């Protein structure tokens, strides 16, 4: 149920990240404790915070504590749906996005004759984390603060003679689906988010 609802499945024990066999160097010591549906891994960092090494090559801290991550996921968030940095430049824009996002999720569940609140609420109870979807904007802000906290969690690697750094879990590329959800163009969104 956790994988289907929150896109996370725990390993039986801590292990080396699967993305450590090609000379990847992580800025923090880490051990994988879970994976997502696409093969990315959640890792416990040496300072106790939580990182994500995605299967698409992005890397970053996503929570300061495991409870923060689980609360964020249970209350409706997919990490990558909340990775657009301009969402966080204006609190009203973030709130508007979060409420539209929750409405979309509830509607998708209803189309499948399921109750989003009932399913996620039961899971929150089972995990002993708060179920407060109305606080999703604050939970998203907590995610953003963890992702941008210095020192950030990054990965570098060599390809031949060149050094590379993996992309961050945060992105400044405007996801088209956000514009569709909020019924605005990229330009409209950016104008609003910078007010």
Task: Give residue spans per PLM region.
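A surface-exposed partner-binding patch
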Residues: 1-57, 84-89, 101-195
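Compact, glycine/acidic-enriched structural inserts
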Residues: 54-93
């Amino acid at each position: 149920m956790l994988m289907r609802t929150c896109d996370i499945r725990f390993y039986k024990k801590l292990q080396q990240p699967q993305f450590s066999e090609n000379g990847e160097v992580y800025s923090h010591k880490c051990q994988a404790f879970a994976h997502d549906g696409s093969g990315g891994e959640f890792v416990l960092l040496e300072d106790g915070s939580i990182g994500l090494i995605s299967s698409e090559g992005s890397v970053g801290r996503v929570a300061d504590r495991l409870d923060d991550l689980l609360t964020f996921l249970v209350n409706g968030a997919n990490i990558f749906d909340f990775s657009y940095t301009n969402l966080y430049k204006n609190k009203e824009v973030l709130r508007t996005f979060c409420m539209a996002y929750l409405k979309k999720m509830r509607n998708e569940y209803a189309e499948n004759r399921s109750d989003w609140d009932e399913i996620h609420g039961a899971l929150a109870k089972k995990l002993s984390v708060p179920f407060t979807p109305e606080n999703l904007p604050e939970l998203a802000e907590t995610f953003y603060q963890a992702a941008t906290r210095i020192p950030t969690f990054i990965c570098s690697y060599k390809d031949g003679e060149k050094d590379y750094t993996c992309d961050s879990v945060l992105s400044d590329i405007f996801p088209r689906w956000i514009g569709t959800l909020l019924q605005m163009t990229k330009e409209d969104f950016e104008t609003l988010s910078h007010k």
